[in-house]
Each structure stands twice: as C-alpha cells, then as structure tokens.
Curated annotation (Swiss-Prot):
Positions with a binding annotation for Mg(2+): 251, 302, 329
Keyword Oxidoreductase part of the UniProt annotation: no
Cofactor note: Mg(2+) is required for catalysis and for stabilizing the dimer.
Subcellular compartments: Cytoplasm
A Gene Ontology molecular function term of the record: magnesium ion binding
Gene: ENO2
Entry protein name: Enolase 2
Chain positions recorded as substrate binding sites: 164, 173, 302, 329, 381-384, 405
Highest classification ranks of the organism: Eukaryota, Viridiplantae, Streptophyta, Embryophyta, Tracheophyta
Catalyzed reaction equations: (2R)-2-phosphoglycerate = phosphoenolpyruvate + H2O
Amino acid sequence: MAATIQSVKARQIFDSRGNPTVEVDVFCSDGTFARAAVPSGASTGVYEALELRDGGSYYLGKGVSKAVNNVNSVIGPALIGKDPTAQTEIDNFMVQQLDGTKNEWGWCKQKLGANAILAVSLAVCKAGASIKRIPLYQHIANLAGNKQLVLPVPAFNVINGGSHAGNKLAMQEFMILPTGAASFKEAMKMGVEVYHHLKSVIKKKYGQDATNVGDEGGFAPNIQENKEGLELLKTAIEKAGYTGKVVIGMDVAASEFYSDKDQTYDLNFKEENNDGSQKISGDSLKNVYKSFVSEYPIVSIEDPFDQDDWVHYAKMTEEIGEQVQIVGDDLLVTNPTRVAKAIKEKSCNALLLKVNQIGSVTESIEAVKMSKRAGWGVMTSHRSGETEDTFIADLAVGLSTGQIKTGAPCRSERLAKYNQLLRIEEELGAIAVYAGAKFRAPVEPY
C-alpha cells in the first residue's frame, strides 16, 4: 500500500527580516513528516505570481493568515489521500483546479496565493523523497529527468546596494564566484577568505560602521560609484590570492531605478530630489556595462535593464552574451511563458530560478528544462527575506543548475543553504562533481 497524505498544516512564521511568511507541515500515512517554509523578496518583479498578504494594520499589512487559512481549509483537505510522490499531479491540481486563476502569463495563483501553494508544493516534495527513501536532491533530479548531479558554483553577494541597502549605490548586488575551485568545499574556502579580506579592506577605507551587513549578509559601504564596488572586489580577491580563480557577478535590479515616463535609468535614484544629472538612456547604460566587462573579470550580469525593456536586453545579449551571462530575473520571474518569449526574442541567456516567483516545484522544473534546452545558463536563487529552509540547495544539485546565489557567507539563513551543499557534496563522495568553469552549461540538457 503506497503512503498517502494524511494531513497538511500551515502556520505563520517569520522570515529573516521579521516579516510573516508561511510554513507547512505534511504528515503521511506511513509516518513520514515533512516541513517547508517559503521566502519573500524585497525587489519583486511585477510579473511574479501573487504573494498573498493580509493588508490592514497588523504586521504593517504583511500578515499571511489568509494564505495560512487557504492551506488549512482549502488545499490541505483536498490533498488527503493523495500520493505525495506524484509531485506533478499534486502541483497541477493545486494550481489549475483548486486555484484556477490565470492571466496572460499563465497560472497566477491569485485566489489562494503563490506563498500558500508553494509551501505545500515544497513540503510535498520533501515528503515524496522521504517516502522513496532517497535524498531530496535525487528525488528532484528524478522528477526532472536529470541523470547527472552537479554541485553549483556559489555566487556570494558580498557588497549590497539598490533596494537592499541604505547607501547611495544604485546597483543591487556585487557577487564573487569561485569558478577556479576544484570542489564546492574549496569554493566555500575561497569565498569565505575573500569575504574576510573584503571586510578588512572596507573597514580600513570607510571605517568600522561600513562593515555592518545588509539583508543578505553583504557589506553596504557608503559608496555611490558602482565602479568603486567592483574595485573593492578586485582588491579583496587579490589580497586573498585568488585572482583568476574568483570572478565577479552583478545583479543590477535595474527595474528599481527605471523611469517609464522618460525611459531613463537614474543611477542616483536613492538621493531624494536629485537634479537628474545621472539619468541615462538604455543604450548608455549598456555601454556602462560593456566598460565594466572590459575592466573587471565579470562573468554574469543580472537584470541589467527594466523588466519590460526587452529591446535593450536583446541588444546587450547580442553584443556581449558570449563572454558574459545575461540573467533574467524580474524579466522572466521563473515563468515558463516569459521564458519562452525571451528564448524566441534572444532577450537574455540565463534564467534566475526563484521558486516563489512562480509558486510550484513543477512549474520551476519546467522553466529550468526550457532554459537548458535553449542553451541557457540557470542560477538558483534565494530571496532577500529568507528562512532556515534549505530546499534550494537540494534543488540546485537535483537540477544541476551549475550556480546558486544565496547571499554572503554570513547570517544563518544564508549559511543554512551553503552548509547543506557541503553535506550533499560529502554524501555524494567520489561521484561529486563541482560545476567550476562550466557553470553556464554543467550538463547536457535533459
């Protein structure tokens, strides 16, 4: 007799920013128990599936009792008796039948909330792995039809700007990627050493308070020039002795400083009542990136333009997409329909995989498979408001995305994922493969 779902229980817990989020427990007939919690983002794309919040004054409108109630009274009862190893069936049932809301980009989860559906989807996935008595990453690989497991290159967000920090820096994340490491364990060593060198470089140059950390564990020194951020990384990498082995990635989150009115990007957007002297066109911004790429070892640029600026995305991908990965986050929101459009229009060449943008494991797998078949890279990602849940570590290995960004090597909700990857590498032993320099295409498409 196959194990079935006996009960599903949701509760409100808190993310790393002190905002409410949803956690779900799934109990099965064979005694299996699984628990999952969902994260939430600060710079959210307008095309993301609906994250259901309560509104009102409690928790400044960010309560999730409606989403919790939707799990406890609608989703949970409907899943009793179902087989938790049948991930696709359960996800499709929740998304298409129990919720059923659609917009031009597909299933939008507006009735029950992507946070409610995803929490259940993640917990069911963990339960399915337990029932099959296989590790979660292997269960995910089986669901996707992926035959080769690969440990991802970590992209550590060590300098924060944009909506994540109180400094004047327009661009949101400056990351280091230890592509020259031979294993994930060695990548952690390189990343951690560069991080500590960076801390002392920043402290010396900007003072002790510049080493306070942001939401994702990175530093937020009060610099305004984006180039200064790159310079700090270059210096820290040199001091650690990893020049050529540790490279640089950026997440610009340009939608945050784009003005639809005059179609410009304001690199001084955090200065109130600024004179507009740093507003530039999409073409000028593209040239800023090109100059960065020629001067620094940059291998990845995420969200270089606004989420609706398909034109400049395509231009940039055509011009420097061979040497640099152009990653769509707000542009794609892990949505298979938007991914298909971007593949057709050659808008970018890599997917940022955030399970809570789309709201189910099945749709996430679909977006990844489409991306890989198009020859794209895939980077698994956390959100700025995280929990101690480590699902995305197993997801990155199971789907062999080749890359993961889950913050700096600082703050427990970030390290939880990196530590899980260390455990997975150890468990795989001799068959463990680290993506390294092949992070953009670590496996053949599956």
